[in-house]
Amino acid sequence: MVAGHFISPSVIFPLSRMANQTAAAKTAITPRRDEDFPEWYQQVVRAAEMAEPSDVRGCMVIRPWGYGVWENMQRQLDAMFKATGHRNAYFPLFIPLSYFEREASHVEGFAKECAIVTHSRLEVNAEGKMVPASPLTEPLVVRPTSETIIGASYAKWVQSYRDLPILINQWANVVRWEMRPRVFLRTTEFLWQEGHTVHETEAEARAETKQMLEVYETFVRDHLAVPVISGEKSESERFPGAVQTLCIEAMVQDRKAIQAGTSHFLGQNFSRASGIQFQSRAGTQEFGWTTSWGMSTRLIGTVIMAHADDDGLVLPPRIAPIHLVILPITTKEETRARVLEAAEKLAGELRALTYFGAPLEVELDQRDLGGGLKNWEWIKKGVPLRVELGPRDLESGTVAVSRRDQPVKTKEFLPVPELVRRAIELLDSIQLNLLERAKQFRDTHTRVIDSKEEFYDFFTPKHSAKPEIHGGFALAHWDGSREVEQQIKDDLKVTIRCIPLEDTANPSEPGVCIFSGGLSRGRVLWGKSY
């Protein structure tokens, strides 16, 4: 039904000479996914040392391992932005309240989430407590998004059509008050990138909106190994002030949707509000056509929920801070020096390799910990490849290699030269396998539905007291009315995730709305979401 939005199945490289061992009954993470998915997610984040809640309600501390993932995502996505002609800049964190008031629908959409600065300093009162002092003449909004403040700069920069297009991206933090925080998925402060562009014509701006959606789709699919469905948001789900919002939607392992990225065609709404005008080729004054688009640290939560298992994190190699960890087994003092020497030699050979345009990241773990403890630490952190090297391996000239996308007790014994030769191939195999596995899961839990009864049954858990994992994505006809959309949201907490983009592989399919009996221009994607 929507196959045209997905890449073809990947080849999964076979592993030879496997030494399969029976998996332990206990798992490293409790509870398991099928027992309590939300708590499982929190435990995976904690066990992998990705992040933790801050003392500031709704905020998080991103720990080095989690930030290493973000750095890789940032570096790779930034290169894709630059390849499409965009440059980076930075704009103020604080936005005058009057700037927001210029665009009424934008203000209304963000009003409940805004943090406001009202005073310029602190002073000690008579009781010896610090209190706000010196009220500001105009309150300042702490950046929830930057269309208005960036628009003020663009209004100064743009005078003529010759100044266009402006193609700028910003890496920044934003603040939106969050009542129900969840690490990476919903936090009051989070990291993101936001692109903001101005164009001479509507056609150019619409092309930019579509192009950046395609950049996001490629990045999430090929770098994060998460398949997505590209589409347009319904009017009620549209970005405040936008004419059109395009999005990519991913399914995670509890069958809920996560909005993985958005690209907005803003028309001339924000250019009129900010005064972005230029002299046209005909000599007349025209308002610019603008776009904005963004992705955030929410993507890290998407990766965790899409790939992690009951033993911890599973990282796609392309964004892993470490690709391969070497675990020397040095239980006997008389062989310790020889084992470490061999491990250091192997690490050097592997570090000389290049993976995905950068040096292969290899960790040689020489900590004075038991081999089992070290092994499980790296399992929980999701390192793609683990290599064990001990005295017996020195004699045989082999090492034990474990892939994180395989059962944790599974090992492949490889001669050292073969490991060096095949390391990149193995990483590519893991990357492709994770994507194919996620795609198969998504497709298995996506259903074409043609009746209201089947729709309600699909999204209703069998056990209301403690709902089991249920539902998924439903492709069903909708008449386009807000009333139907709101009724489904009220009844089932199900929303229209997107109206899938039409292409030659996915022509629109007119039909009848399964809720109202009215005419439908095509099926839309429904689901529960984060």
Regions found by a protein language model. Name each.
Residues M1-V2, R281:
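Intrinsically disordered, low-complexity segments enriched in small/polar residues
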Residues V2-A3, V11:
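Acidic, Ala/Val/Gly-enriched low-complexity intrinsically disordered segments
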Residues I12-Y530:
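NTP/phosphate- and nucleic-acid-binding module
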